[in-house]
Swiss-Prot record:
The lineage of its organism: Bacteria, Pseudomonadati, Pseudomonadota, Gammaproteobacteria, Enterobacterales. It is a multi-pass membrane protein. The chain crosses the membrane at residues 12-32, 42-62, 70-90, 102-122, 137-157. One of its GO terms (cellular component) is plasma membrane. This is Lipoprotein signal peptidase. The active site is at residues 123, 141. This protein specifically catalyzes the removal of signal peptides from prolipoproteins.
Amino acid sequence: MSQSICSTGLRWLWLVVIVLIIDLGSKYLILQNFALGDTVPLFPSLNLHASAYYGAAFSFLADSGGWQRWFFAGIAIGISVLLAVMMYRSKATQKLNNIAYALIIGGALGNLFDRLWHGFVVDMIDFYVGDWHFATFNLADTAICVGAALIVLEGFLPSKAKKQ
């Protein structure tokens, strides 16, 4: 039985495009205006810091000789396809899940673009307290984390709210 894309979660794919535009635009601006390693303080505890990142979160596989680029690219493609299928199978009215999936897909594709185009992921947000610095990250990473948090939140909502 065929169903209209607008009646499925794929209706929310526009959010993937928004995430990609914002993420890739921010990375473009960083690469055009900063040398890798440059840091500019924005606020207390927040810097812009242009960096090339070869691994995954918290330096996972960062020094593995290059093969991890393709490994993480495959993961990004696989997760994006899986979530797109889940969006297709869900109703457009299941907003929270579909927004979460779209944020994760947008973030995954933003970092995938970096890995394929540059050979590394461009990170620029440096949050710190005193001398302790959190791992530098980008807007794609933020979209992925917000999407994951929404999925967790959805799990705690009563079933009536899940259908909204």
